[in-house]
Amino acid sequence: MSIRVEEFGTTKDGQKVKKYILENGKGMKAAVLNLGAVLAELHVPDKDGTLRDVVWGYEDVAGYEVNGPDLGAVVGRNANRIGGAVITIAGKDYTLVKNNGENNLHSGPDMYFTRMWKAIIADDNKVEFSLHSPDGDQGYPGNADITVSYTLTDGGELQIAYEGKADRDTIFNLTNHSYFNLDGQESDSVLEQKVWLDADAFTPGDAGLIPTGEIRSVEGTPMDFRTEHTIGERIDADYEPLKLAGGYDHNYVLKNEGTYALCGRLISDKSGICMEVSTDAPRSEEHTSELQSLFAIS
């Protein structure tokens, strides 16, 4: 196991951005930045032993300072949408910025992935990033201290852990917004890649992709990934939730009941790469990019 640090560039306001490269004994590599605690690269050996970078990112700091698709980003304090850009915490309403129609998306516009995080090498295979989010930041109550760590194991696991401490009731709903294509950077589609999800239900959204409150069974619908099949097999089905989202962009109700367990799998027969996802979160968002070239599981 090894970690090396490289200079990646400089932000518009003159701050140095560093790239932390974690590498295991099998050649697998992950690169993370102190700008946004972003996962910038993930190189995985394919069936022939050739390394493929399976996450999308930018070649320079300027790309990450804008980062419209949130590539590799740590999103918080809240990931995804808040209807009407108003959240109720401990009986009090807090008004957020409307940055997605009438709603708030990813706690923007001042998002965590545009900020510089403090970084330490916590072990020979672990980098830890920390950020202080003051009371009122993004419209949320409470001073919050947030830690995100990346650990790369010799078993081929990239472990992402989130920790938050606040001095008031607040929301803490972070995610990593990486997009994956297991065929690597030269591929322009994920439609032939296969997905399995351990979920019996999902939460339909309205036209603004805000959950309606319904928990709907996936049985007999194109949302059912309990039996592995390709992303493209049903993505164009005549089904209202798919039409509203322009493909898959839905919250699945996992069967893990809040315990750490395998919840999903993405497979490429072409590259021979298989990615398994485990979590203790009760829900998982599955999202195909607008060009159907990438797949996110958060």
Where does each model-flagged region fall?
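An exposed, glycine/acidic-rich loop-and-rim segment of catalytic or binding clefts
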Residues: 1-289, 293, 298
